[in-house]
Amino acid sequence: MAGGTLADVQSLARGENRPAPLDASGSITVSVTGAAVDVSALLLTAAGRVRSDQDLVFFNNPVGPGVRYAPDGVTVDTRGVPAEIETVAITASLDGSGPATFGGVPLRATVGSELDFPMTGLTTETAVVGVEISDADGWKVRAV
């Protein structure tokens, strides 16, 4: 793991907030693994809404303001996120090639090389918000 060893990784509990482990350039990468999933990012205003289609970053729209898609994850460059964006929500949805729901699927979000969020207790869900990266008195990560 770049930047840390397995022993350095801290687990997040559902609902827990932590300072975002930004790299030297102010970026953070979130990866979602454990099943064949489509990862997306929604750039949300304080009202919890996207401003336009550009605020939805996924495989068919791989670059948005301050956010770049990569298979199984996204990278958020906090310096490029517009001031009116309060939260970047990282989502995962089943891609149709595997199970029909997340019930029994071992799904986890890895934030940078320091934080890990095992998404447990899922049952009939086909899409989930895994983590949110928010700018509230400094960039924070919340396990949803």
Language model regions located:
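Intrinsic-disorder/low-complexity signal
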Residues: 1-144
